[in-house]
Amino acid sequence: ADTIVAVELDTYPNTDIGDPSYQHIGINIKSIRSKATTRWDVQNGKVGTAHISYNSVAKRLSAVVSYPGGSSATVSYDVDLNNILPEWVRVGLSASTGLYKETNTILSWSFTSKSNSTADAQSLHFTFNQFSQSPKDLILQGDASTDSDGNLQLTRVSNGSPQSDSVGRALYYAPVHIWDKSAVVASFDATFTFLIKSPDREIADGIAFFIANTDSSIPHGSGGRLLGLFPDAN
């Protein structure tokens, strides 16, 4: 199975798999059952910003999700990624819909990793302020596609309307050196802007930023509440 560390923007509470009874952001370590969550209210049809950072000295993974002029939601969890992730990883964005639906549109995405070691100054930086129609630097999986407006659509959209039972992911093509033999782990920052929109009152399921082994693919049956990340709810 894939090794996944993720930050979820979860728009539908699945209390049967340990979700709180409200929309939330969460930190997931190798399981859809979040290690830490905080309440988050999605604003239907508004552009939001998610900022994820890992401090490799403090060994703390943090996320802040906000809307312009609104309040922000913050969650953090202490974890040593050296013990969890392989030495080389890929970073990606994932989203899903199930019975309920929403657009999972990404308008921009940036990432920077930086090693704390002077010996291994291998770092990676990328910025997408828009997405080309046939992106050579992205690995698109499942229903993910780029549209003529320069946006990344992680799940299926038809004539501007979100579709149910859809799952898609986009990974940056170049692997990231997340730690080396001296056990020095890279710090990183990721930011993406997103638009979640639905004509329905009930929406689902959410967007996640994730880090995985370089050959990671969408697990079979991982749509809906599993956000395209995990094969089951364990």
UniProtKB/Swiss-Prot annotation:
SUPFAM superfamilies noted in UniProt: Concanavalin A-like lectins/glucanases (SSF49899)
Q: What InterPro entries does the annotation carry?
A: ConA-like_dom_sf, Lectin_LegA_CS, Lectin_legB_Mn/Ca_BS, Legume_lectin_dom, Leguminous_Lectin
Q: Which UniProt keywords apply?
A: Calcium, Lectin, Manganese, Mannose-binding, Metal-binding
Query: Where on this chain does Ca(2+) bind?
Result: 10, 12, 14, 19, 205
- List positions binding a carbohydrate: 12, 99-100, 225
PTM section of the record: The alpha and beta chains are produced by partial proteolytic processing of the lectin precursor by an asparaginyl endopeptidase.
Q: Tell me which family the UniProt entry assigns to this protein.
A: Belongs to the leguminous lectin family.
Further information: Binds one manganese (or another transition metal) ion and one calcium ion. The metal ions are essential for the saccharide-binding and cell-agglutinating activities.
Q: Subunit info?
A: Homotetramer.
Q: What is this protein called?
A: Mannose/glucose-specific lectin Cramoll
Species assigned in the record: Cratylia mollis (Camaratu bean)
